[in-house]
UniProtKB/Swiss-Prot annotation:
Catalytic activity of the protein: guanosine(46) in tRNA + S-adenosyl-L-methionine = N(7)-methylguanosine(46) in tRNA + S-adenosyl-L-homocysteine
CDD domains in UniProt: AdoMet_MTases
Keyword vocabulary terms for this entry: Methyltransferase, S-adenosyl-L-methionine, Transferase, tRNA processing
EC number: 2.1.1.33
Origin: domain of life: Bacteria
UniProt protein name: tRNA (guanine-N(7)-)-methyltransferase
Any matching Pfam family: Methyltransf_4
Species for this entry: Mesomycoplasma hyopneumoniae (strain 232) (Mycoplasma hyopneumoniae)
Amino acid sequence: MRLRNIPDALERIQNQNLLVKTPWNIDDSWIIEIGMGKGKMISQLAFDNPNKNFLGVEKYPSAAVKSIKYVKKYNLSNFFILISDAKDLLDQIKGKASTIWLTFPDPWPKNRHYKRRLTYKDFLKIYANLLVKDGILKLKTDNLKFFEFSIESLKENGWKITYQTNDLHNSLVNSSNIKTTYEEKWVNLNYKIHYLEAIFI
């Protein structure tokens, strides 16, 4: 589905004091979601974990602005937004986070686009530099081929997969899972969601 452009999206985010000024300093109290979309999942995490800080990274302001309704609903003071491409994160963020989420990234299915996948080795280096020792990278996707690519890429680039499942909603970790807007759509169509956790070793 094409994202509808919202001309004043960036201004609306700024007016809510949600937009971070770069470079933004973080520590191990921070959890990052890359490609947060409308922010449903990360805002719920922020509400459930008031002693932690959450940074939603989104390339498109017209998607990120939708998170404002959740900020208001939950009265959040521990959630912030960075408008950025994932490849630029080391220039935008200083410090190390405890967890990075990749939630339903574009699988870039064509072989010639494999370097754009967010689990390609160049991106994995960025995440390794943004995570504390034993920090966790978490991935959710509905695309099995992308999931398989991600598993191999992680193994080949110094990561250890500590948990994986091809059916998140019938797994041991489902009780703590918070669905994204995109995820809810596919679950209603009985799609299986693939999930993994990994640490850099």
